[in-house]
Amino acid sequence: MTTFLQRDDFAVTARVLGALFYYSPESHETAPLVQALLNDDWQAQWPLDAEALAPVAAMFKTHSEESLPQAWQRLFIGPYALPSPPWGSVWLDRESVLFGDSTLALRQWMRENGIQFEMQQNEPEDHFGALLLLAAWLAENGRHHECEQLLAWHLFPWSPRFLDVFIDHAGHPFYQALGQLARLTLAQWQAQLIIPVAVKPLFR
């Protein structure tokens, strides 16, 4: 049986979403993706219903006084408190800290499965964008069982809450649309998962 993880569009969409959440919009990884989302052609390539994508596509193209790099800095870097921190342990740890127990559990799982994933900087591995990039890499390398585990155990327990808060506080139409696109896409993935999503308490 072919699972959704074995389709090319899973790896592509995971890599696109992961890059847009992880890298600056001016970076060589994401600048072409940003330009693609500002046009209409991408909708035909995205594995979601066109009717659901139409309002998202319109929002991507909505003008904002704040530049995209400024919005990315505010949402992902600081210097002020991030409105929706993109690290899993901030949501899963009672103290809402980086490098929390959930991060350590992810590291242990990666070690047990022989997975090495280089982070851009000295930051936790449970960054939302990084986990999507890792999911894409696992799917591209035929490691579908590990990809399902990553999604069900280490991403989906907290990502819906993260995305809800991210969308509400994005403050920029491009990133609000990106959050909505991610929420729609991940909900479709979750509906097709074979293994159940781990139930974990959230503290934000």
Swiss-Prot record:
Domain of life, source organism: Bacteria
Molecular function in Gene Ontology: signal sequence binding
Gene3D superfamilies: TorD-like
One Pfam family per UniProt: Nitrate_red_del
Record organism: Salmonella typhi
Family (UniProt): Belongs to the TorD/DmsD family. DmsD subfamily.
Alphabetical UniProt keywords: Chaperone
Keyword presence, Chaperone: yes
Gene expressing this chain: dmsD
One Gene Ontology term from the biological process aspect of the record: chaperone-mediated protein folding
Its biological purpose: Required for biogenesis/assembly of DMSO reductase, but not for the interaction of the DmsA signal peptide with the Tat system. May be part of a chaperone cascade complex that facilitates a folding-maturation pathway for the substrate protein.
Name of the protein in its database record: Tat proofreading chaperone DmsD
